[in-house]
């Protein structure tokens, strides 16, 4: 049993990118579906396909190099990190995104700031 499924998902994406794989499969959960949807919406992955028990994420490359250059898990099961709406960090001076779990669902940092909601800072992607 995994203690941190979100970190496992990010690690699978990172490892698949380093191995230049076309797609990666991760076990399905609603939180991971929301994370994958945000990655697709922000242009970090090509496509997201949800099946009964897993999520297939088609990775995106630009001239043979991965679009995602870094992934970082912020809030962990042992150390939760919460931020208010006005304390949402800018990632890589605006070149990346942060993903939060809020009362309005899982949102990227810009959307959470526009809606003026804070929450648990899940990860940063650049």
Swiss-Prot record:
Matching InterPro entries: Ribosomal_uS8, Ribosomal_uS8_CS, Ribosomal_uS8_sf
Keywords, alphabetical: Ribonucleoprotein, Ribosomal protein, RNA-binding, rRNA-binding
Any GO MF annotation of the entry: structural constituent of ribosome
Subunit-level organization: Part of the 30S ribosomal subunit. Contacts proteins S5 and S12.
Family: Belongs to the universal ribosomal protein uS8 family.
HAMAP family xref list: Ribosomal_uS8_B
Protein name in UniProt: Small ribosomal subunit protein uS8
Organism: Desulfovibrio desulfuricans (strain ATCC 27774 / DSM 6949 / MB)
The encoding gene: rpsH
């Amino acid at each position: 049993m995994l203690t941190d499924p979100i970190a496992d998902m990010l690690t699978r994406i990172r490892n698949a990118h380093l191995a230049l794989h076309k797609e990666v499969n991760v076990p399905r959960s609603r939180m991971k579906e929301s994370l994958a949807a945000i990655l697709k919406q922000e242009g970090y992955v090509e496509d997201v396909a949800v099946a009964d028990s897993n999520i297939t994420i088609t990775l995106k490359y630009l001239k043979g190099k991965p679009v995602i250059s870094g992934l970082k898990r912020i809030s962990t099961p042992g150390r939760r990190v919460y931020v208010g709406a006005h304390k949402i960090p800018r990632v890589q001076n605006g070149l990346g995104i942060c993903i939060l779990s809020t009362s309005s669902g899982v949102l990227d940092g810009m959307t959470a700031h526009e809606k003026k909601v804070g929450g648990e800072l899940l990860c940063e992607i650049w």
